[in-house]
């Protein structure tokens, strides 16, 4: 499977016709048909319904089409960014993040980075905390903002702060009648929605460990992939969900209460390659220090 096959398939999917797609790609139709056939053999399922006019996508083909567009778009971004760096037009800083950090330190930091380094091309990549460590080692990102501690000697990490946790409750829950901090033991027996389902360890494990430390046994535990799904299920009254306090603004059709419990917090951790002294890594760390020095209580509601 290669990028050429991706481009060929996308052309056929858009044109819904092999002849027009071949003309657009400036190739003969037989080689185009052969490459699509090889692609289908490699993925193991049909992607096109050829005996219809126009050509139709199978369900698998629609999924592959959406993913192929994303892959090709990402490749184009990589090529453009690489050319800019090679021509010394712009420098690139790739930042990995978990979604919940977008509601805390990250937006302010990005604005400051652009102010101090307007020549910098900042690329944001959403990755789970565990994935960030691998991406840093592989050079796919330069900095990561996550929530899980690690032991990789090749990656340096700093805990920016310990963020308080909150519980998202259905509006009709008896616990939603109050807004005071919720004692963690009141979560005993509740249907609990945790995220992410994978990769592990992750934020879900932090939540379960906190409950275990307080000898709290939830009822049914449902695992989902991301915080947006979890909060949607809370709104639909499928259960409750523990989230970082900064994420309380994500939905307004659920009720939030801070959690009152020993070490009921989640760290916000910034990571980068060990011994990386590049100027933009140094600038990022400097700006973070300045932000906390200027506003030591700027996350009061979260700390």
From Swiss-Prot:
Residues 1-58 form the HTH lysR-type domain. The lineage of its organism: Bacteria, Pseudomonadati, Pseudomonadota, Gammaproteobacteria, Moraxellales. Belongs to the LysR transcriptional regulatory family. One of its GO terms (molecular function) is DNA binding. Pfam families: HTH_1, LysR_substrate. Keywords: Activator, Aromatic hydrocarbons catabolism, DNA-binding, Transcription, Transcription regulation. The keyword Endoplasmic reticulum does not apply. GO terms for biological process: catabolic process. PANTHER family: LYSR FAMILY TRANSCRIPTIONAL REGULATOR (PTHR30346:SF17), TRANSCRIPTIONAL DUAL REGULATOR HCAR-RELATED (PTHR30346). This is Probable cat1 operon transcriptional activator. Residues 18-37 bind DNA. One of its GO terms (cellular component) is protein-DNA complex. Probable positive regulator of the cat1 operon which encode enzymes responsible for the degradation of catechol to acetyl-CoA via the beta-ketoadipate pathway.
């Amino acid at each position: 499977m290669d990028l050429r096959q991706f481009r060929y398939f996308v052309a056929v999917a858009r044109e819904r016709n092999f002849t027009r797609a071949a003309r657009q790609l400036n190739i003969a139709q037989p080689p185009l048909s052969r490459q699509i056939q090889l692609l289908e053999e490699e993925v193991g399922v049909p992607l096109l319904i050829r005996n219809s006019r126009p050509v139709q996508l199978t369900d698998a083909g629609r999924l592959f089409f959406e993913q192929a567009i994303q892959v090709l778009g990402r490749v184009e971004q990589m090529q453009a960014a690489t050319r800019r760096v090679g021509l010394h037009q712009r420098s690139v800083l790739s930042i990995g993040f978990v979604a919940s950090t977008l509601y805390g330190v990250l937006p302010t930091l990005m604005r400051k980075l652009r102010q101090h380094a307007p020549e910098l091309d900042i690329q944001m990549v959403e990755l789970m905390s565990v994935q960030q460590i691998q991406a840093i080692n592989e050079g796919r990102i330069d900095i990561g903002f996550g929530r899980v501690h690690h032991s990789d000697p090749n990656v340096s990490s700093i805990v920016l702060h310990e963020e308080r946790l909150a519980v998202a409750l259905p509006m009709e829950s008896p616990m939603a009648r109050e807004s005071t901090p919720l004692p963690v033991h009141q979560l005993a027996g509740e249907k609990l929605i945790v995220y992410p389902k994978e990769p592990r360890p992750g934020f879900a494990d932090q939540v379960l460990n906190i409950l275990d430390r307080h000898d709290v046994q939830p009822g049914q535990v449902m695992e989902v992939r991301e915080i947006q799904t979890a909060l949607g299920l809370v709104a639909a009254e499928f259960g409750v969900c523990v989230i970082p306090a900064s994420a309380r603004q994500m939905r307004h059709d659920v009720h939030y209460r801070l959690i009152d419990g020993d070490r009921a917090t989640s760290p916000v951790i910034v990571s980068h390659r060990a011994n990386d002294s590049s100027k933009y890594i140094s600038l990022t760390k400097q700006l973070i220090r300045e932000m906390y020095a200027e506003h030591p209580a700027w996350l009061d509601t979260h700390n």
